């Protein structure tokens, strides 16, 4: 009868959906595994290039021009290494293959560590950074994956210094209120290009979407923690990112 035919059709549809979901899951797993494999294969030769570049950079027997070129090789190699890390991480976060290793993270010491690592990075150049923490934020403890949260802040800082032709001043502000931790990263540079901001704020990609992998990873990390990442132009000029995390 009609009921029997309907049940048969529903079962058929359910089986088709199940098979389709299996295919999608296998495809996603294959993509994640492929990216992880390629990332792993690139790391070894890249480490050699970086090591040799550093040796040449420090070799006083070489002319200054050659040492300067070696420094450029090191800088670009670091950019490639960061890009590979972001590519691997965004894939894992997208398909739920990146476990969150949550632990108690005290905000004050964590942000001071971010600042110290920024100054130790060659990418910082002559840029400067200051921290402004409220008393509440200083001692606030958030349950988070510290390594991922550090990556999010690193990506914001590297984006800031990497997309400005001259050194910039970066400010990291933090406050805790109403069950939320807010971390703001602002700079006094040229700000986000309009095309980048259109993608970040409204998801408008256009025909030639800008490459915002590093900032997309920031969004994914915050989303994985149940938080948000918002981007805007700073006033009078510069870029501003606001990260929020539930406490």
Question: Where is each model-derived feature located?
Answer:
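Short alpha-helical segment of the dimerization/phosphotransfer core of two-component systems
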Residues: 22, 75-80
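A residue-level detector for a conserved hydrophobic packing site
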Residues: 80, 149-153
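Acidic ATP/Mg2+-coordinating residue in the GHKL
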Residues: 187
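Conserved micro-motifs of the catalytic ATP-binding
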Residues: 95-100, 141-144
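A conserved beta-strand-to-alpha-helix junction within the catalytic ATP-binding
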Residues: 101-116
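Membrane-proximal HAMP signal-relay module
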Residues: 1-36, 49-57, 212, 216, ...
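Short helix-loop "hinge" at the ATP-lid/N-box region of the Bergerat-fold HATPase_c
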Residues: 159-161
